[in-house]
């Protein structure tokens, strides 16, 4: 598909995939230390013209320069963890005249605004990460969309005739 996208005029190729890797390194370590998982064989089959892969599924946070694993595939591989606890800032600099990608960088930022409690207990602020003051304008914007989506989000889409458990199967999924 990449040749068709390039032929149609695409200058930058970004792949979104709901599959991820396991990462034993820091959330911003581009070396890809300890990266493993079922996404790797998929990545190794991607066209070398891919510039960025935004991944997920494993709920882990990472920014990986995939050229450290496979020099023939010099794209960035990113994931922002889970539940909005991390946001990935991605910067793709493209020459406006030629359309050539000049540089690509990504950085994961831990998002925390205030301590809270949930069913699992207290969730305190972590002093080693910056805390962001909640913005009323963004809360209002999110509230508008939450309200607009409420009917669809609460719509019954099926029923379950038996018990649903959170017991983990052989693959670790529940």
Regions found by a protein language model. Give the residues of each.
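Structural recognition of alpha->loop->beta junctions
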Residues: 30-61
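Mobile, glycine-rich extracellular loop/lid and propeptide segments
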Residues: 17, 45, 59-64, 92
